[in-house]
Amino acid sequence: MLKKSDNKMTDQAYWCVVSGSDIWVNDDQFPFGSAEELGLSVEHAICIGQHQGRKVYWLNDCDVEIELSMVSLRDLLHWPESSFLIASKAIQYGHMTQSMRFCPQCGGRNHLNHNQVAMQCGDCRTLHYPRIFPCIIVAVRNDNKILLAQHPRHKTGMYTVIAGFLEVGETLEQCVAREVKEETGIDVSNIRYFGSQPWAFPSSMMMAFLADYAGGTLKPDYSELSDAQWFDVTSLPDVAPVGTIARQLIENTVDDIRKASVAEQELEH
């Protein structure tokens, strides 16, 4: 539930002012203080939770009269998870209010319903909840190697694991197998859940898996990828940044391979 506060002008609180995928930060942390001290107008400020025992307020930058120094959410991947998730939440709420201004049922004007985390039509009263796009992301292992791919959108040339959107009528496990097959031509088995991460670019939920190579020849789909290779864990390329669940998958797989290698060496001796 979103909460309005009668004390927004004087509350000592953290503030999340967002614009698209950008957020206001001060000295690499959430700005802290009262709205009065920070020069913020609070008519549209909404409490979206707590951080370190203090309220967190969200505002869209269009509701702020002063110019603020904004940074991309991607630049905050080094933040502690609790802080990054709060920033992600604010950005996703901002995206909801900006992308769902009109009701798809009747065309009426939507407004934010503070009792439901949703936009509500002023005419037909239909509630429209935030759009969350489910995606899978998977690290595939083949003995002592990991499958990594390079995407044209990654200008730095980094490599990462395979990912894709869930289709209608599809289980997560089916999606894992399909995406790997479509993008690389290989089959996988032993698909197992690893973890998840909200990914506010603009509103995805990444559901992470581990899988094992089961067969097929690596044939990258060059309409989707720039490259895909099996990499030995001793010679990895530049990979996804720290803070991403892609990096967690890669590190977990590399650790498992190294542990297995050590165990094999101990058995030989």
From Swiss-Prot:
A divalent metal cation 2 binds at E179. A motif (Nudix box) lies at residues 164-185. Disulfide bonds: none annotated. One of its GO terms (biological process) is NADP catabolic process. Substrate binds at R74, Y129, Q197, P198, W199, A200, F201, P202, S203, S204, A246. Residues 130-253 form the Nudix hydrolase domain. Its cofactor is Mg(2+); Mn(2+); Zn(2+). It comes from the Bacteria. Divalent metal cations. Mg(2+) or Mn(2+). Zn(2+) binds at C103, C106, C121, C124. One of its GO terms (cellular component) is cytosol. Its EC number is 3.6.1.-, 3.6.1.22. A divalent metal cation 1 binds at A163, E183, E224. The keyword tRNA-binding does not apply. A divalent metal cation 3 binds at E179, E183, E224. One of its GO terms (molecular function) is NAD+ diphosphatase activity. It catalyses: a 5'-end NAD(+)-phospho-ribonucleoside in mRNA + H2O = a 5'-end phospho-adenosine-phospho-ribonucleoside in mRNA + beta-nicotinamide D-ribonucleotide + 2 H(+); NAD(+) + H2O = beta-nicotinamide D-ribonucleotide + AMP + 2 H(+); NADH + H2O = reduced beta-nicotinamide D-ribonucleotide + AMP + 2 H(+). It is an enzyme of class 3 (hydrolase). Homodimer. mRNA decapping enzyme that specifically removes the nicotinamide adenine dinucleotide (NAD) cap from a subset of mRNAs by hydrolyzing the diphosphate linkage to produce nicotinamide mononucleotide (NMN) and 5' monophosphate mRNA. The NAD-cap is present at the 5'-end of some mRNAs and stabilizes RNA against 5'-processing. Has preference for mRNAs with a 5'-end purine. Catalyzes the hydrolysis of a broad range of dinucleotide pyrophosphates. Belongs to the Nudix hydrolase family. NudC subfamily. This is NAD-capped RNA hydrolase NudC. It comes from Vibrio atlanticus (strain LGP32) (Vibrio splendidus (strain Mel32)). The gene is nudC.
